[in-house]
């Protein structure tokens, strides 16, 4: 089995997106992430899908059963079988990350994570979404997390950009300024 990274993973992701209905991608990605998680946690399952000691027919059978149980479309089953036969199914996690990134790009969306010390009220969540939409020029999908160590305020990560408006972050900046003199 060969690892799949970078341009090769992106190529497979583009192939996948050309096979499926773009509106089904979020649901399919969610189910593929389940497969990736199983491959990471269950060594026997991973070996069955990736080891050359198992015949292609055996792997195709397992993939077919898995796709049926997860309710994955026929195109996805064919794609997983293709990856298995190519010997690159071990790189499914990286491929799924590219599928998700290319989907968001095609839909002109970005994903972000908002971390706060306490649960945020809906009106604040809406203001954050509107502000990020104005900054990025794209629709924003946010995931919310709670981290009491922030003390107050929020930390927002969108793509590779971090906006730290937390008290903890501001205290860190103040500390750095005091140290530098």
Swiss-Prot record:
A Pfam family name for this chain?
A: OSCP
Q: Which Gene Ontology BP annotations are present?
A: proton motive force-driven ATP synthesis
Q: Which gene encodes it?
A: atpH
The UniProt record lists the keyword DNA damage: no
Family annotation (InterPro entries):
ATP_synth_OSCP/delta_N_sf, ATPase_OSCP/d_CS, ATPase_OSCP/dsu
Function, as annotated, reads: F(1)F(0) ATP synthase produces ATP from ADP in the presence of a proton or sodium gradient. F-type ATPases consist of two structural domains, F(1) containing the extramembraneous catalytic core and F(0) containing the membrane proton channel, linked together by a central stalk and a peripheral stalk. During catalysis, ATP synthesis in the catalytic domain of F(1) is coupled via a rotary mechanism of the central stalk subunits to proton translocation.
- Oligomeric form and interacting partners: F-type ATPases have 2 components, F(1) - the catalytic core - and F(0) - the membrane proton channel. F(1) has five subunits: alpha(3), beta(3), gamma(1), delta(1), epsilon(1). F(0) has three main subunits: a(1), b(2) and c(10-14). The alpha and beta chains form an alternating ring which encloses part of the gamma chain. F(1) is attached to F(0) by a central stalk formed by the gamma and epsilon chains, while a peripheral stalk is formed by the delta and b chains.
- Would you identify the family this protein belongs to, as annotated? Belongs to the ATPase delta chain family.
For molecular function, the Gene Ontology terms on record are: proton-transporting ATP synthase activity, rotational mechanism
Alphabetically ordered keywords of this record: ATP synthesis, Cell inner membrane, Cell membrane, CF(1), Hydrogen ion transport, Ion transport, Membrane, Transport
* Stated name of the protein: ATP synthase subunit delta
Any one cellular-component term (Gene Ontology) = plasma membrane
Q: What is its main location?
A: membrane
UniProt signal peptide = none
Source species of the chain: Thermodesulfovibrio yellowstonii (strain ATCC 51303 / DSM 11347 / YP87)
Taxonomic superkingdom: Bacteria
Q: Where in the cell is it found?
A: Cell inner membrane
Membrane topology note: Peripheral membrane protein
Is Transport included in the keywords of this UniProt record?
A: yes
